[in-house]
Amino acid sequence: MSSKEQKTPEGQAPEEIIMDQHEEVEAVEPNDSAEQVDPRDEKIANLEVQLAEAQTRERDTVLRIKAEMENLRRRTEQDIEKAHKFALEKFVNELLPVIDSLDRALEVADKANPDMAAMVEGIELTLKSMLDVVRKFGVEVIAETNVPLDPNVHQAIAMVESEEVPAGNVLGIMQKGYTLNGRTIRAAMVTVAKAK
């Protein structure tokens, strides 16, 4: 026997063995290439992920900016509305001492004296027309008695015992208060009833 015949497995010719070895090599090669990933495909997949993340960030940014713009628009409208409503506040604050002076003049005027009747009537008409004008611009007088004390519109100066007015209610007005479009610009100075 030759050396080739000794090494061959039984029943197989040497050519068959060589062909089998080539088939095994060929069969292995396609498996190796299937396991290998093309670096371009991997890079494309990474870029697609990055693109999706960037698009999500961009959408979030756009939505956030839209919300901020809407909030800014709303705040600006509110600020403008308040500016229109309360633009007169300084002016009204300057008028209040004049109104107070007319009120005091009426309180101390001798209404029984016929010589003073014309002057008292003039002061009353002046005060009435001034209050009518400021009411047109949203100013309201706080001068009610026998109402519960409201710290938003009343400033308690003293407590006085009273049987006619329930405890905790306004008994008397020391100085009138005023509101401008619902905002207190000067609280009324009041005396408050307390139980005996």
UniProtKB/Swiss-Prot annotation:
Its main location: cytoplasm. Keywords: Chaperone, Cytoplasm, Stress response. Pfam families: GrpE. Residues 1-40 are annotated as: Disordered. CDD domains: GrpE. GO terms for biological process: protein folding. GO terms for molecular function: adenyl-nucleotide exchange factor activity; protein homodimerization activity; protein-folding chaperone binding; unfolded protein binding. Gene3D superfamilies: 3.90.20.20, Head domain of nucleotide exchange factor GrpE. It is found in: Cytoplasm. GO terms for cellular component: cytosol. HAMAP family: GrpE. PANTHER family: GRPE PROTEIN, GRPE PROTEIN HOMOLOG, MITOCHONDRIAL. Belongs to the GrpE family. Homodimer. Participates actively in the response to hyperosmotic and heat shock by preventing the aggregation of stress-denatured proteins, in association with DnaK and GrpE. It is the nucleotide exchange factor for DnaK and may function as a thermosensor. Unfolded proteins bind initially to DnaJ; upon interaction with the DnaJ-bound protein, DnaK hydrolyzes its bound ATP, resulting in the formation of a stable complex. GrpE releases ADP from DnaK; ATP binding to DnaK triggers the release of the substrate protein, thus completing the reaction cycle. This is Protein GrpE. The lineage of its organism: Bacteria, Pseudomonadati, Pseudomonadota, Gammaproteobacteria, Enterobacterales.
